[in-house]
């Protein structure tokens, strides 16, 4: 079982002959834990980004898909934008050095970049598909069929753990402080991401369409997106 915040694992794995199921998901919600930032004061809204360079952690990924959809909704042709692959930890420096005009980054690096002088242009996932999944944990269909009890336990633990920490953000931050090297001032300011379940079938259909539309897969997705979904009872 694995998580996928980069390439759209559902449609690409299905395309490559490896049927998988989506067990839990990370929604794009009001928290805005993924955002497009810039150091350039002339870039203040999505419509300003035509003809610019935008850093993403992985090319041909969920990141480029979501930013492209967000740009297109704002009237910007994504083909006029150059996506540049930059590791998340290097994005702030890439903006500072002028290597890129903007960056699509994630917490806690988002808050660190804001402290370093960047400003938010927008939150592509939350702005375009609020409350919809953009990452998740996946398992092969064979594993799902062979290990229903384990999958049910994993799903229960994920959901209950998430509900617990979201009800107590101070404890959530204490756990992050214990298990990560995030500076205390960043922990205090950062937006806390949340897992949720179940996932909606419509976002799987949307992502399947967008992976083809923006060139991640060479042909339209032919499978049934609902077959990518599986949520254990309990």
Name each model-derived stretch.
Residues 73-79, 216:
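Short helix-capping segments at alpha-helix termini
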Residues 145-218:
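Secondary-structure end/capping motifs
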Residues 8, 84, 89-175:
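Pocket-lining segment of extracytoplasmic ligand-binding domains
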Residues 28-29, 126-129, 194-202, 222-223:
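Short, solvent-exposed loop/beta-turn-alpha elements that line the ligand-binding surface or hinge
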Residues 40-48, 76-78, 142-151:
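Short helix-loop capping/hinge motifs at secondary-structure junctions, enriched
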Residues 212-234:
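Conserved C-terminal helix/tail region of periplasmic/extracytoplasmic solute-binding proteins
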Residues 1-74, 85, 101, 120-123, ...:
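Short, glycine-/small- and polar/acidic-enriched structural segments
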